[in-house]
Amino acid sequence: MLLQFRFSIVLIIGCQLFFLSCLNNQSKQEDQYILIPSVLEKDFKEGHYKKEIKKIKYAYSPTNDSLPILYGLTQHIEIIDNPKDAQIEFAIEPEEKFIEESYSLQINEDKIIIKSNDSAGLFYGFLTLNQLMEDASNQNLQLPKIKIYDKPKIAFRPIQIDVKHHLEKKSYYYNLIDELAQLKINGIILEIEDKLKYKRRPEVASSDALAIEEWREISKYALARNIEISPLVQGLGHASFVLKHKKNKPLRDDPNSDWAFNPLNPKTYELQFDLYLDAIEAFPHGKYLHIGGDEVQTSGRGSGKSPLELNLIWLNKVTSFASKQNRIPIFWDDMPLKQANLMGPIYNNKMSKSEVDSIWMANEPNLNRFIEQFPKNCVYMRWNYHM
């Protein structure tokens, strides 16, 4: 009886040690492989892929899909017709759990399997495989047995690039797109200003501006890597790049300042729409047209209208134009809030809740008086450099 009891104790302790060993091994593996951005689900298994990383050379698709653009250690992978000779099997096979850009990646002892909902998901599946291969190679490890399911938590994942102050060589932007693609960024808002050779308004372009065709090629390159570039052309304010030119001075809100357009001058819109059309030609694959609109207050050359009224006149005209071009307009929303005396609480994190509430109680009617005039087809975006 005593011997049986001792055996049971040893068996229990042995099972506990084995379980802890498995947990420690999984934790160690997770520390060894850093996926950026992190994936939704990952499950490390016991064991490793049995072949050397350098021998991962061939891929087979039972659905006859093409390989996506490849990076790093996956660049040399070729597609073949014989599944027995392929280390990777991949397919675009929509499944119930898949959404746009989602994929699954499974590394077994003798096969790597990637499935996706669409070409973007396939692209991201191979990017994740490359990260695992590079981490393993850099640490002289074998590829882990692992099962990954990944989908985006945020559908549109853009960054903003501002080229108005300085334009790099074209090669820089191609290289940057490659870097962003590997981080699964899928959008760029490009603040272009005078760095585009406008055909309709050539005086606006700077001497180092790129032609529409050159930006279009960059946009095409980005799209092939699942990145859509949308232009940002400053509208009501930040307009010095347009209004500094002699022929455009009559469009100034203040004749002595090149900062802002007069929103009551019809020719303001003729010029702005020309700039938008050229920008859309240069970036034909984007869904959006960012029209700017921040940090500006106008008088309409002493019209008697309030700055908020004038802002809304301009905003409605340009958002309507953007929609007619099948673009979703994006607008910086700081000025309507500022003009309604509601901007302060947004950037002052030292205010108490009661202070914020009191400001909104007092000033919300300033905004509500015009609320029906705000366009409904517009993305209202807020910049914040104080976070």
Where are these regions (language model features)?
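Bacterial Sec-dependent N-terminal signal peptides
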Residues: M1-D31
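Detector for intrinsically disordered, low-structure N-terminal pre-sequences
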Residues: I9-I12, H76, I291
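Acidic, contiguous N-terminal accessory segments
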Residues: C22-A120, Y124-Y149, F331-P336, I346, ...
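Short acidic, S/G/P-rich loop/turn micro-motifs used as interaction or catalytic elements
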Residues: P62-S66, L167, H386-M387
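Feature activates predominantly on carbohydrate-active enzymes
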Residues: K97-S323, I330
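Catalytic-core regions of glycoside hydrolase
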Residues: G286, V296-M387
